[in-house]
Amino acid sequence: LLRQTAYTEDDVAYLPDHGEITLESSALALIALADCAETSGNTGYIPACEALGAGILSLLDTGTGSFTHVLDASDLGRKEAVRSAEWDGMGVTALCRLYGLTQDPLWLWAAELVLDRMIEEDPAQYGDVWTACALREVTKYAQDRTDYFVFALKHAQVNMASVYGAQGTDPAGLEMLLVSCETYGAMLDAGYSADGFASELLQEIIAVRAQRQLDGYLFPEYAMYFAEPQKVLGAFMVREDGLNISASGMCRNIGGYSLYAVYCDKLAAEKPSEYEGA
């Protein structure tokens, strides 16, 4: 990843992707390096993270809070203003992770600038896990911004029905709701009220979705029908996408079920066993 990162003369870094510079690739690279830095404690990753952060800032119009999503890698000219709404959430998440590493207020300021613009728009269009991640990350540091918490709950609530009704095995919905659940818990811990939020419905949908998503898990009984069962055993597939198995889908499933395990442990700790005291 570090070898593929391209630097300008001003120590601004991007991750080129098939002749393009995209907000997506640079944000994901920064998040991955931030994970490495936090997990290993190796501060040697921070300069690369800061350079990628500067690259993300170069895509940001500070007057409007909007990102340019795609540049031409050959001359850094603007190629596409918006390619995917979820990329905004990726950019905000990356900037917040960088703030967590460096405590440089520039990164948090930029993240809030983008979120302020997103809040003014229709939250229903951001029905994705990256928006949920962005709100979870920013509320770790901007707990005085009640509007961010409100936006997080609205984002979850307007997307509950679509996640519940989804019959396929796409993993994004489960992770989105679990991340939103974390933000909801942080909101309560910060002393804010969440009156009107359908928390019990959220818990019900999370449980249903976690069970339904297992239809895409390749148990031995499913894997045996593939040409090379040993290569797919224990993987996740997306049934509605031609039984496709992808690295991104695997990451989403692992991320979602990891959060679900933590969520279930927390629920168990909060609810006394029916046998307690028997």
Label the predicted regions.
Residues 25-63:
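A charged, solvent-exposed segment within the mature domains of Sec-exported extracytoplasmic proteins
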Residues 44, 79, 106, 147, ...:
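A structural signal for alpha-helical segments
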